[in-house]
């Protein structure tokens, strides 16, 4: 039985109103996999899997201690960025294994593993098409909750933002999250997706979010219509 589209869902929209916004999004934006961060207890093992078993990819970024000499850092992590695909592919996706380094406080990576297990900490989707500001405005109308403002990184020419937790976790501050980003330059001259300042700043931002322990999900799951069934959904968006 089809869902009653006059009822309201996340964002306070009727499902009919939601259809109109979703059609607009599909016409104006494309989302592609940019990278994914994977929390692990052993970065050597996981990196070996990607480099020596699955892809033979290239490491484009290494950080044995993201915090480095930062005197204000209370914890840290190790990470590498592995490019998937050929050397000359500007739009290649990346896998980024991360291993926590505890300090004054537990590393956010180990905090995540404690609550969720070893798995994806966030998946980054890259926007192509119109501006990320317009995408955020439209998705917020649909009920998407973002836990960061729109962040700009001038070293990577990157705009990015993070959603609330992807699942009904008992501890949403632990994640996992979705990152939405827009790379303003994927030219032949600038293909570097990972800069140390970007990674360091992002780690600090997520650590502060976890310390606040705000219970934020990506959408209010309780407001999803009870009669919505993925196997009954017949929504199509004609061009």
Regions from the language model: what does each represent?
Residues 1-61, 71-239:
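Glyoxalase I/VOC metalloenzyme domain signal
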Residues 65-67:
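Compact beta-rich and alpha/beta scaffold cores in large eukaryotic transport/transcription complexes
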